[in-house]
Amino acid sequence: MDYRACTSALRMPVLLLLLCTFSCNLAEQEVENLSGLSSNPDKNIFAIRENGTTCLMAEFSARILVPYEVPSSNEVDWDLEEASIQLPRDTEIRGKCWNNESELHLSWLDKAYTLKLFFSKEGQDASKSRSWKMSKIQFLYDPSEHTIFKSGARPGRHTANSHHLSLMVTPAGMSYECEATQRISLTSTDHQKIVVLYLSEVHLQPFDIKSDFVYSEEYKCPTDQRKQLEETLPLILGLTLGVAILIIVAVYHIHHKMTANQVQIPRDRSLYKHMG
């Protein structure tokens, strides 16, 4: 066999693999920062579209508390401080959408800060119990950025990670909604300090979006469900009590009317002599 022919035959699978990879990377992705539509200045709205179809939607308010150290007044020790970082509206968005995994990356201040949210699906495709969840959170930061951190803070880029996360578990095909504030602890590479992420006014759907920019049916978090029950329970009890009172009044009225129409029989036997 000709050497050139053999070489060409061997190259074909490699070329096909490269073409496949290249075509996948060419998948057209659009990111939308729609935070300006929210009346709440602290709330952010994001959407990711691939090939003209919305594949991830997210709305939430995020605040991050980061402990860090600055030199003490004696210039020997270190004092512990805490930075409060609000997710701003002018955020750079990136993301990825796959069948069973999705990611949302949010960066700001020239990527001095980056918040990454990871989502995954669970269960078999044919199973009715199939669901999705937030499976991982990463926050990247550098205390030497002086817009938020005090000067003199220990420099160095750090990453705060979640461990064994299973948040916002939602039935497949539904969106997740939670007005209540959720507190999530992350462990930092900065001497294992605990970074705290607060999420509120959350509405998320990282999979199975049927219409562009339209959430599927909402699955409310347990806290919101309890709050809704607490708000509606007094109304239900009031209506039940009102109906019970109406029934009692109606029964009394009917009973009174029936007894009024009956012939009154004298109880004193001496009165019987006047009868007949």
Curated annotation (Swiss-Prot):
Q: How does it sit in the membrane?
A: Single-pass type I membrane protein
Q: How is it modified after translation?
A: Glycosylated.
Keywords attached to this entry: Cell membrane, Cell projection, Cytoplasmic vesicle, Endosome, Glycoprotein, Membrane, Signal, Synapse, Transmembrane, Transmembrane helix
Residues assigned to the Extracellular compartment are: 28-231
Tell me the first and last residues of the signal peptide: 1-27
Question: Cellular location of this protein?
Answer: Cytoplasmic vesicle membrane; Cell membrane; Cell projection, Dendrite; Cytoplasmic vesicle, Secretory vesicle, Synaptic vesicle membrane
> Which residues are noted as glycosylation sites?
N33, N51, N100
Q: Which InterPro entries match?
A: Lamp2-like_luminal, Lysosome-assoc_membr_glycop
Q: Which GO terms describe its cellular component?
A: cytoplasmic vesicle membrane; dendrite membrane; early endosome membrane; endoplasmic reticulum-Golgi intermediate compartment membrane; endosome membrane; growth cone membrane; plasma membrane; recycling endosome membrane
Q: Which Pfam families match?
A: Lamp2-like_luminal (PF01299)
List residues traversing the bilayer.
232-252
Cytoplasmic compartment: which residues? 253-276
Provide the function of this protein: Plays a role in short-term synaptic plasticity in a subset of GABAergic neurons in the brain.
Which family is annotated? Belongs to the LAMP family.
PANTHER family given in the database record: LYSOSOME-ASSOCIATED MEMBRANE GLYCOPROTEIN (PTHR11506), LYSOSOME-ASSOCIATED MEMBRANE GLYCOPROTEIN 5 (PTHR11506:SF35)
| Protein name in the entry | Lysosome-associated membrane glycoprotein 5
Gene that this sequence comes from: lamp5
